[in-house]
């Protein structure tokens, strides 16, 4: 791609089709020293990967609301202990010349661990620990994986009305 050939994209062009979080994830998928070949297929793959992480965190958030408030079981503690190994892989990848592609694979390991080892029967402490482990590593990479609740237009209008009447 080159500007003189006219076969390039600006961030503004890409943002019309994709969320900028997807672009960030796409760029993190490759080593910073290597050139990145842009294609819509690769952007779709990045979108799917990011959606997979967001879905895992969203599912854990829903489980967290209905989880029981008791102490972690021994099996749950073993799973949480295994996250420390994944943290080590993440840290090693980042120490290896900022290898974000390998760091992302560590995040996907956590997602796989969370998806296969979480259910409505787990404790709140356990579900929260799994969720926080994914969110923490994603946050280090600059990825926002917790979905913000959007306010509806009527809610916004009601809040504005409250502010106007209290002033």
Regions found by a protein language model. Name each.
Residues 2, 6-167:
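Structural preference for alpha-helix termini/caps and helix-kink/transition segments
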């Amino acid at each position: 791609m080159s500007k003189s050939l006219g076969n390039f994209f600006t961030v503004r062009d890409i943002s019309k089709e994709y969320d900028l979080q997807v672009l960030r994830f796409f760029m993190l998928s490759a080593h910073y020293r290597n050139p990145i070949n842009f294609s819509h297929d690769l952007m779709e793959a990045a979108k799917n990967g990011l959606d997979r992480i967001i879905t895992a965190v969203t599912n854990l958030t829903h489980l967290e609301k209905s989880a029981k408030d008791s102490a972690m079981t021994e099996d749950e503690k073993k799973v949480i202990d295994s996250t420390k190994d994944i943290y080590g892989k993440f840290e090693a990848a980042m120490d290896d010349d900022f290898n974000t592609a390998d760091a992302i694979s560590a995040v996907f390991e956590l997602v796989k661990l969370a998806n296969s080892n979480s259910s409505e029967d787990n404790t709140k402490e356990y579900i929260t620990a799994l969720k926080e482990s994914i969110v923490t590593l994603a946050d280090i990479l600059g990825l926002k994986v917790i979905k913000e609740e959007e306010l509806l237009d009527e809610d916004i209008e009601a809040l504005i009305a409250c502010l106007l009447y209290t002033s």
